[in-house]
Each structure stands twice: as structure tokens, then as C-alpha cells.
Amino acid sequence: MENVGGVYLVPIRINDTITLDAIVDSGASDVSMPADVVLTLMRTKTISSENFMGTQTYTLADGSKVPSQRFQIKSLKVGNKTLENVMASIVPATAQILLGQSFLSRFSSWSIDNEKHALILN
């Protein structure tokens, strides 16, 4: 895990196919992926139309509400921890990948070790 500009980036492995960096964001409801990343995942057949689950309205940090297409990631790996069937949402192409509560809340506890720059998942 790397601290970049005050946020922590952690490598995530999607469907055991592609590894990308995500911001650890406990305030995000779901794992969020920019539209261009989702298109890449579709082109590489990492996800397909069968993974899409409809639209949900999300409330952003500024209080505004935005609809977003949801999809399911078959497997998402962070470090040595892999979860299956993780919900994700599509955000504008200019956004970062966020590692949100649809992943984090499935652990009994999680924390960030600032000294070791590590995400601890239990």
C-alpha cells in the first residue's frame, strides 16, 4: 500500500485477470470503477453483461444524488485476501477506483497501519 497525496492506494486483482490501484475509501458504499476501466474489463472478458445488476442512486459526500450502474465482480483480491461476488458501481471516467464498503465491510475488522503502510484485513 502506498500513501499518495494523503490517500492510500492499494493494488487490487479483479477476477484473477487484471491488477489495478484503488483508493481505500471507507465512505464509499461500493467498490467504484471508472467507466473506462469497466470498458477495459469488458473488452478483456473479465466481466460481461451478465454481471450487471441494474441502477442504484448513491449519495455523494457533498449531498448530491447520482444514479450509477451496478455490477458484480466475481473475485476481488487485496494482498492475500480474496472475496467473491463483490458489488461495484460505475463512476465517470475521470474518477479513481475506490475500494469501498462492499469489500471492506465483509471483514470482521480492517484497519490501516500508518507506520507499515499496510491495509490489515481480518
Name each model feature, range by range.
Residues 1-122:
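Pepsin/retropepsin-fold aspartyl endopeptidases
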